[in-house]
Amino acid sequence: MSEKHPGPLVVEGKLSDAERMKLESNYLRGTIAEDLNDGLTGGFKGDNFLLIRFHGMYQQDDRDIRAERAAQKLEPRHAMLLRCRLPGGVITTTQWQAIDKFAADNTIYGSIRLTNRQTFQFHGILKKNVKPVHQMLHSVGLDALATANDMNRNVLCTSNPYESQLHAEAYEWAKKISEHLLPRTRAYAEIWLDQEKVATTDEEPILGATYLPRKFKTTVVIPPQNDIDLHANDMNFVAIAENGKLVGFNLLVGGGLSIEHGNKKTYARTASEFGYLPLEHTLAVAEAVVTTQRDWGNRTDRKNAKTKYTLERVGVDTFKEEVERRAGIKFEPIRPYEFTGRGDRIGWVKGIDNNWHLTLFIENGRILDYPGRPLKTGLLEIAKIHQGEFRITANQNLIIASVPESQKAKIEKLARDHGLMNAVSAQRENSMACVSFPTCPLAMAEAERFLPSFTDKVEAILEKHGIPDEHIVMRVTGCPNGCGRAMLAEIGLVGKAPGRYNLHLGGNRIGTRIPRMYQENITEPDILASLDQLIGRWAKEREAGEGFGDFTVRAGIIRPVLDPARDFWE
C-alpha cells in the first residue's frame, strides 16, 4: 500500500443500537405491518419508528402544537414525512398529477415540498394514509424505497437543460446507479404493495444484512454546473465529455456536511479525488465504494460513521486502493474539469435539441396555493397539457422540460397567470433553507419560515451599499445535520436555539470550499449588523468579479478551512 493508514480499518467496540435494530429487523420488516393496524396511537412504536425510514418515511409531529396537546394529555399529533425516490429529479406529468391529488386529499398541509435532494416530499401523512401513499406511488411507477436511513439515498444528477444529449446520458447513469444499489429485500413490496411472501431467504449482496453504517449519498455531476453540490455527498461521478458525448467519470469520494454542535470529532468535509474511470466500470466502482464503506465504516458511533470519517481514519490512498481491488480496475489520472456556478438559470433556455426548457423559481421548494399566487394549481394545469416532463432541481426549483416551440406561449401564460414567473432578485434565487419547524423533530431554529423575510433584509443591505443586482450564496439550516447545505454557502446559518444561529462565512460561489464559523449563537439583528458591515466592505473593496465568500477570505476576515479534520473548529 502506498500509504500507512493512520487508524484501524475496522473500529472495534460495542455496536450502536441501530446495528442491533437492523440485524433483528428481518431485512427491514420489523413489526411494521402489525403496527399499521394499531389504532391506539398515530405513530409507530419501538424499532418501527426507525425502520420506517428505510421505507422512505420519517415520523414527525406538529411542534407548533406539541405543548398544547401535552397540556390536554394528548399524544403529539403524529404524521409521516414521505420522500420519493426520483433519480435525477425527473418526473412525468402523469406522475405529477397523481402526487398533486394525493397532497390535496390525504395530507395535513396539502403541499408538495421540492427538496435539495432533487425529489419531492409529502408532509403530514396520517397513519391511515401511509399504505395508500405507497400504493399510489406504485400505481404511477414510483416508490419511496431507500430514500432515508442507512442506504444509498436518492441519486442526484445535474439539471442541464441546454446540453440535452449529455443530460440524457448522465441521467441514465444516475438511474442505473440508483437501481444497482437498491436493497434486495422484499419487505417494501410485502408491507406496502400486498405482494405475497416468497419462501426464499433474503440476501443483500451489496448492502449486507445490517445495511450501511450510515446514510450514503451519490451524485452524477455535469460540469461546469455544480448545482447538486457534489461536496455534500459520499460518492460523486463527474461527467467527462468529448464532443458533447459522455465518455467516463472522475470519481470523488467522502464529502459530507453534517456536524454536531460542540463535538470536535465531527466536521464538514469536501470530497477527495480518486481518479478517472471509463463508463463501463461505473457500476463496479459504485459497488466497490459502497461495500468498502459497508465493511470499514464505524458501526460503534453513528456520529462518526459516514464515509468522510472512514477516509480520514484509514487514509484516502488506502480506501482508494481497496476500491480498485474490489472493482478490478486502476483509476486513471483525474481529467480536467471546472465549475463556474451552481444556481439554476431561471426562465427559458433553448436546448441544442431545439426544445425549450422553463426553469421556475419555487421559494424553498414549497408548492402550495398562496393568496394571489396559486402555484400548485398552476403546475397542475401545466401538467395537464405539457407533453414533456418536469425536472426537480437540487436548488428546490422546477423545470418544465422539453417544451416544443408550438406550446411555449401557452405554458408561459399558465405560469404567469398563476404567479410562477414573478420577478425575484438574484439574491432570492441564490438563497435556500431546509424545512425545519414545525415538522422536523431535529429543528433547533426556524429555517424555511425564517428565510423569506431574512432575504428581504439582506436585499435591503445590498441595495444600501449600491449593489442590488449582486448575490451571495446564502443557506439556512435549522440544525447542524445540515440539510440546508449551509456548510457549502458563502453565508451559512446553522440553527442553535430558537432565534439563534451560528454564522459561517468563507465558502465560495461554486461550492468547493467549507465555510468557517465566524460568530456563534447570535440573533437575527446581530447577524444583520455583521453582514451590513461586511457587505459594505465587499461592495467597496472587492476585485472584479470577486464573490463575497472569496472576498472574506482574501481580506483576512475569515481563515479558509483547508483540512477540515484538523482545522474546521479552529
UniProtKB/Swiss-Prot annotation:
GO MF, one annotated term: 4 iron, 4 sulfur cluster binding
Keyword set includes Iron: yes
Disulphides: none
Metabolic or biological pathway, per its Swiss-Prot or TrEMBL entry: Sulfur metabolism; hydrogen sulfide biosynthesis; hydrogen sulfide from sulfite (NADPH route): step 1/1
Positions bound to siroheme: C483
Cited SUPFAM superfamilies: Nitrite and sulphite reductase 4Fe-4S domain-like (SSF56014), Nitrite/Sulfite reductase N-terminal domain-like (SSF55124)
Cofactor: siroheme; [4Fe-4S] cluster
InterPro entries: CysI (IPR011786), NiRdtase/SiRdtase_haem-b_fer (IPR005117), Nit/Sulf_reduc_fer-like_dom_sf (IPR036136), NO2/SO3_Rdtase_4Fe4S_dom (IPR006067), NO2/SO3_Rdtase_4Fe4S_prot (IPR045169), NO2/SO3_Rdtase_4Fe4S_sf (IPR045854), NO2/SO3_Rdtase_FeS/sirohaem_BS (IPR006066)
This enzyme's EC code(s): 1.8.1.2
Cofactor note: Binds 1 siroheme per subunit.
Record field: catalytic activity: hydrogen sulfide + 3 NADP(+) + 3 H2O = sulfite + 3 NADPH + 4 H(+)
Segments passing through the bilayer: none
GO CC term, one of those recorded: sulfite reductase complex (NADPH)
Keywords: 4Fe-4S, Amino-acid biosynthesis, Cysteine biosynthesis, Heme, Iron, Iron-sulfur, Metal-binding, NADP, Oxidoreductase
Purpose of the protein: Component of the sulfite reductase complex that catalyzes the 6-electron reduction of sulfite to sulfide. This is one of several activities required for the biosynthesis of L-cysteine from sulfate.
HAMAP family referenced in this protein's UniProt entry, alphabetically: CysI
Subunit structure: Alpha(8)-beta(8). The alpha component is a flavoprotein, the beta component is a hemoprotein.
Protein name: Sulfite reductase [NADPH] hemoprotein beta-component
Organism: Salmonella paratyphi C (strain RKS4594)
Phylogenetic placement of the source organism: Bacteria, Pseudomonadati, Pseudomonadota, Gammaproteobacteria, Enterobacterales
